Amino acid sequence: MGWDLGTRLFQRQEQRSRLSRIWLEKTRVFLEGSTRTPALPHCLFWLLQVPSTQDPLFPGYGPQCPVDLAGPPCLRPLFGGLGGYWRALQRGREGRTMTSRASELSPGRSVTAGIIIVGDEILKGHTQDTNTFFLCRTLRSLGVQVCRVSVVPDEVATIAAEVTSFSNRFTHVLTAGGIGPTHDDVTFEAVAQAFGDELKPHPKLEAATKALGGEGWEKLSLVPSSARLHYGTDPCTGQPFRFPLVSVRNVYLFPGIPELLRRVLEGMKGLFQNPAVQFHSKELYVAADEASIAPILAEAQAHFGRRLGLGSYPDWGSNYYQVKLTLDSEEEGPLEECLAYLTARLPQGSLVPYMPNAVEQASEAVYKLAESGSSLGKKVAGALQTIETSLAQYSLTQLCVGFNGGKDCTALLHLFHAAVQRKLPDVPNPLQILYIRSISPFPELEQFLQDTIKRYNLQMLEAEGSMKQALGELQARHPQLEAVLMGTRRTDPYSCSLCPFSPTDPGWPAFMRINPLLDWTYRDIWDFLRQLFVPYCILYDRGYTSLGSRENTVRNPALKCLSPGGHPTYRPAYLLENEEEERNSRT
């Protein structure tokens, strides 16, 4: 066995050497002006007749591995390397034998991009990469198909190798990061190495770095000698950028700081715009298990083929759906056809008219509901009137919302947010919430709290202890506060005699308690949240109807049931039939 393996290795090496000699001879004939030069495409086809079967000793070698066919440097500028030519041939063959996605654009229209994110801090988890999302989304809006994203360390050789690979494969290459004055900013050097170039000071960049003032910025003026400078307009100021975007061939070198990168790309969109292509997309939300609808999705993709791309993405954290479907096409027609196709085949009622931007569109949706004249709409209108009165009497710095992650205060926060959007759209102050931390909170509740802070752009005022102790601490640390909005309902303990505006009792820290939801019921709260697709704590979908700490909160026995497989489980809180059993979750 060992002798046979050695023999086959030797034979394979001899075969590779023979192909290399043939390649060099054909290249010499071409460069010397042979009469066969006009037949170059045929010559290239002949040269590409490498073994098409997989080699058991080298399974990566052959048509799937274009490295050996890259060709000499003198031909790469003409043909992008024979590896690129081979890949084009392979794509043509695959198109006849494989089901294609809509992302494979029509020949002649396709503009592609590869993104290289540079930085040890990304690979080590020190910094979260947000540039990739922005670059992919923006390029797609410009008609550019992003084919590959790579994250590489601050190493010259590694960056150079990736730049070389990407430059030969894609229309545009965008790098992000590694541009600056420090030792680990090596992107300029790496790109120079990738193209056999050298770093030289550029007069315009030298002037720009001097304008920055101080010392240590000289490194920014050292760019590959073949670099081009692009001066765009800053979308934030309307003024020309002080520092240009540097490019070398088809590689564009962006800063890694997200704020700068976004401004530069917004100001340089014209460099990448592909007017021949406009991508169209649609998102569908399905309240069904992904495995159960997988056959339907496979049939749909096979039915529409190259006309449309269908993606399926499960979401275990959503209150409203289990799977998000994305439909992508270069034309609107296939999207509508696929929507009708899926509507007719997915489980009845599983498509959810979900609004992913419920917080951003809160004002429009909440006030529309308030003006609907429905029973719930009248409750919403009454709550908004109380909130608007409080906004007239107090400034935002004097108000805060009592928030513990429960359903009632979640509804209240959404109402308050909508009213501020409508009445004070230009006020920059973030909304304030008072969070009284319990001794042993649910991790899911803590996560929901953090998500809510980001979602609504909140400032959290944190306190501990009983309500009285927390209000005292709040008053001492934030003396400007005068009123707290509460999600109290009359059915809550000791709340039947409250008014919309109720001062705290004697002996308590002096605050005005504002109660917009006094006349709401358990069903009103859930109808409001679910109709407007307001995110709420996931524990409510697991059988909890009233949330406290882990010591005093259990799933509501009234929601216990059997799953389709016969296992005990719990229905979500919004399906509780008897509202009087709401507090059965508390022990």
Swiss-Prot record:
Entry's Gene Ontology cellular component terms: cytosol; mitochondrial matrix; mitochondrion; plasma membrane
CDD domains according to UniProt: cinA, FAD_synthase
Residues carrying N6-acetyllysine: 378
Catalysed reactions listed for this entry: FMN + ATP + H(+) = FAD + diphosphate
Domain of life: Eukaryota
Effect of residue 530 to C: In LSMFLAD; decreased protein stability; decreased affinity for FMN; reduced Vmax; decreased FMN adenylyltransferase activity
InterPro entries: FAD_synth_MoaB/Mog-bd, FLAD1_M, MoaB/Mog-like_dom_sf, MoaB/Mog_dom, PAPS_reduct_dom, Rossmann-like_a/b/a_fold
N6-succinyllysine modifications at: 378
Transit peptide residue numbers: 1-17
UniProt region (FAD synthase), positions on chain: 398-555
Cofactors that this protein relies on: Mg(2+)
EC number per UniProt: 2.7.7.2
GO molecular function, one term: FMN adenylyltransferase activity
Keywords for the protein's UniProt record, in alphabetical order: Acetylation, ATP-binding, Cytoplasm, Disease variant, FAD, Flavoprotein, FMN, Mitochondrion, Nucleotide-binding, Nucleotidyltransferase, Phosphoprotein, Primary mitochondrial disease, Transferase, Transit peptide
Top-tier EC class: transferase
Keyword Aminoacyl-tRNA synthetase: no
UniProt pathway annotation: Cofactor biosynthesis; FAD biosynthesis; FAD from FMN: step 1/1
Record GO biological process: FAD biosynthetic process; riboflavin metabolic process
Functional summary from the UniProt entry: Catalyzes the adenylation of flavin mononucleotide (FMN) to form flavin adenine dinucleotide (FAD) coenzyme.
Classification via PANTHER family: FAD SYNTHASE, FAD SYNTHETASE-RELATED FMN ADENYLYLTRANSFERASE
Domain notes: The molybdenum cofactor biosynthesis protein-like region may not be functional.
Family classification: In the N-terminal section; belongs to the MoaB/Mog family.
Involvement in disease: Lipid storage myopathy due to flavin adenine dinucleotide synthetase deficiency: An autosomal recessive, inborn error of metabolism characterized by variable mitochondrial dysfunction. Clinical features range from severe cardiac and respiratory insufficiency with onset in infancy and resulting in early death, to mild muscle weakness with onset in adulthood. Some patients show significant improvement with riboflavin treatment. Analysis of skeletal muscle show multiple mitochondrial respiratory chain deficiency and a lipid storage myopathy in most patients.
Protein name as catalogued: FAD synthase
Species annotation: Homo sapiens (Human)
